[in-house]
A protein has these predicted regions:
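A short, well-structured edge-of-sheet supersecondary motif
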Residues: 1-21, 251-252, 258-262
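Active-site SXXK
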Residues: 10, 27-53, 80, 122-126, ...
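Active-site helix/loop module of the DD-peptidase/beta-lactamase fold
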Residues: 47-85, 132-164
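Conserved catalytic neighborhood of penicillin-recognizing serine enzymes
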Residues: 64-94, 102, 107-108, 117-120, ...
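Penicillin-binding protein/beta-lactamase superfamily catalytic region
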Residues: 106, 147-255, 268-272
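Short, gly/Ser/Thr-rich active-site loops of penicillin-recognizing serine hydrolases
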Residues: 272-292
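Residue-level detector of functionally pivotal "anchor" positions at catalytic/ligand-binding pockets or at interdomain
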Residues: 290-316
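C-terminal tail/sorting-segment detector
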Residues: 324-341
Length: 341
């Protein structure tokens, strides 16, 4: 792990950096940045530059795939957002955006397949629709209003976003607050925003517009057509929405808990979508059952026994002045306390 930030009620309650990383270091988002692209598509539609029901050829030109014209014109921006283009993801390089790599497999909307190339081509869709480079449009519509920083850069066929960790956390807060930042409603198209964070099709219920969704009855994963009859992350809240990228680039947003957490770093597993690692992190978050001790019920709870005192990494310590520590009691409650000198 390079960085981990946990926010509750809009405030940072845990921020840690590791392995030479700091709050000034930039790192790549991998596929977690698909969610930024989804947001920008919504902004472009809101401003009248495009409609997600438009054929993608309107913005990519004719012959952007190896399909015949009838097949190609059926592919829409919506299909690119939902991974339902029908293009063959089993080609030798599924990241390749050249027309000879984009082969017909099935009709658009009939098959869900995690395919990077059609997603990557949303960048020129945005650029051609708005007449602006992706970084200029992103700065105007997202970065500047929220105080985020970052940059999209091409690496081969891949369109990769780099930012500092707090910028990733800011994006999570924006989503938590329904597209509102400090009273400024950045995305006013509530229909698009809600569609973005809900099941976009019935093939993979756990996928919105490039966002992963928890609490559904089934899910599919990259590289497979198998349907798992379970929630994506069973130990997490059902209203969790997630941005998931290769090597464990993660944003989790939980409206019911007013909670956001992000993780940047190196490879925790070999998955394009680190959902297993995401589950492991929730095992630890679920142990953080912090509660408030009210003055009026102090006497009632004063009989409980203190089990141990730990730091925020779970290491047992002795009381230290001016350092926030966790006091763990035998009734399962955990309190953060600071002993002042």
């Amino acid at each position: 792990t390079k960085s981990f930030i946990l926010l509750k009620d809009g405030k940072i309650v845990l921020e840690k950096y590791f392995n030479g990383h700091s709050d000034t270091s930039s790192w790549y988002w991998a596929s977690a940045a698909k969610t930024i692209t989804s947001f920008l598509i919504g902004m472009a539609q809101e401003e009248g530059y495009l409609e997600i029901t438009d054929t993608s050829s309107n913005y990519l030109g004719n012959g952007w795939t190896n399909c015949n014209p009838v097949q190609e014109n059926k592919i829409t921006i919506w299909n690119q957002l939902t991974m339902t283009t029908g293009l063959d993801d089993n080609v030798s390089d599924p990241n390749c955006t050249n027309d000879n790599c984009l082969l017909y497999f099935s009709d658009p909307g009939s098959r869900w397949a995690y395919h990077n190339a059609p997603y990557t081509l949303l960048r020129p869709v945005i650029e051609n629709a708005t007449g602006q480079g992706i970084n200029i449009y992103n700065y105007q519509k997202l970065l500047n209003p929220t105080g985020m920083t970052g940059l999209f850069l091409y690496n081969g066929f891949n369109n990769i976003f780099y930012s500092k960790s707090r910028s990733m956390a800011r994006f999570g807060l924006l989503i938590l607050n329904n597209g509102n930042w400090d009273g400024n409603q950045i995305m006013t198209d509530t229909n698009y925003f809600n569609q973005m964070l809900n099941s976009s099709q019935s093939l993979n219920e756990s996928y919105g517009y490039l966002w992963w969704l928890n609490g559904k009855t089934s899910y599919m994963l990259p590289g497979s057509q198998f349907v798992f009859n379970n929630e994506l992350i069973p130990n997490a809240p059902v209203d969790l929405v997630a941005a998931l990228g290769k090597n464990g680039q993660i944003i989790n947003v939980v409206p019911s808990q007013n909670l956001v957490w992000i993780r940047m770093g190196d490879n925790p597993d070999n998955s394009l979508v680190p959902y297993t690692f995401n589950k492991e992190v929730w095992n630890y978050i679920n142990d953080l059952a912090c509660t408030s001790l009210l003055v009026e019920d102090y006497n009632e709870k004063s009989k409980r026994k203190l089990i141990k005192i730990t730091d925020f990494l779970g290491k047992s310590v002795n009381p230290i002045s001016n350092i926030p520590l966790l006091y763990i009691y035998d009734d399962g409650t955990v309190h953060k306390k600071i002993i002042l000198e």
